[in-house]
């Protein structure tokens, strides 16, 4: 069933990109709900590649952990669009390596003292980007290695640290998201 849905999605989306655009400005969908505002810029490069830089203002959004975070996140990713699915410009399936740095201060739950979290992560992600007229939708999932001084919550406004079934690992970073944007 999943294979059928993927094939149908690919067939429908093949004719959607009417023009080829080389630039996009995107906002991470629902980033405000997780406590930050994320804006990114993507530029098409030769040989089915693109480069993307994203910046995030931590604290410009809903404070879901009630710890008053304030800081920033920077990330760079380099997309490699897959040959068989590449449709030109900003559309198609891709894989990408990412480098992320997150730095912010927050109120610790136990002491309420301002505490600093500084984390970096190197991720491998895969996703699909679709353009329709001037609208771009980009969704991905990935994981990789994290390092630095983690926050109590394990959430670093660009990736989350492994916390499954009560097992924490401060060196495994996970990331997924959806971005919406404008092509030009």
Range-by-range predicted roles:
Residues 25-27, 41, 51-55, 76, ...:
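Membrane-embedded beta-strand positions of outer-membrane beta-barrel proteins
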Residues 1-20, 184:
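Cleavable N-terminal export/targeting peptides
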Residues 42-44, 79-85, 127-131, 181-183:
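Structural signature of outer-membrane beta-barrel channels/translocons
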Residues 57-69, 101-120, 149-169:
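Flexible, solvent-exposed loop segments that connect beta-strands
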Residues 75, 79-80, 170-184:
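Outer-membrane beta-barrel "beta-signal"
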Residues 29-33, 55-61, 80, 99-105, ...:
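Transmembrane beta-strands of outer-membrane beta-barrel pores
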Residues 22-24, 34-36, 71-75, 119-123, ...:
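Transmembrane beta-barrel architecture of outer-membrane proteins
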Residues 18-21, 48, 83-92, 131-137:
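Short loop/turn motifs that connect adjacent beta-strands in outer-membrane beta-barrel proteins
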């Amino acid at each position: 069933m999943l294979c059928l849905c993927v094939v149908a999605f690919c067939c429908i989306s093949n004719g959607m990109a009417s023009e080829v655009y080389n630039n996009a400005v995107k906002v991470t969908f629902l980033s405000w709900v997780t406590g930050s505002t994320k804006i990114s810029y993507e530029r098409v490069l030769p040989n089915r590649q693109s480069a993307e830089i994203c910046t995030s203002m931590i604290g410009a959004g809903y404070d879901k952990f009630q710890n008053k975070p304030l800081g920033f996140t920077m990330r760079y990713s380099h997309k490699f669009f897959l040959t068989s699915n590449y449709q030109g410009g900003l559309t198609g399936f891709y894989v990408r390596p990412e480098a992320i740095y997150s730095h912010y201060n927050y109120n610790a739950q136990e002491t309420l003292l301002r505490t600093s979290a500084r984390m970096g992560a190197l991720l491998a992600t895969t996703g699909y980007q679709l353009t329709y007229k001037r609208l771009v939708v980009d969704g991905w999932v990935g994981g990789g290695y994290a390092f630095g001084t983690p926050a109590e919550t394990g959430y670093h406004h660009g990736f989350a640290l492994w916390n499954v079934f009560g097992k924490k690992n401060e060196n495994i970073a996970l990331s997924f998201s959806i971005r919406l944007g404008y092509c030009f």
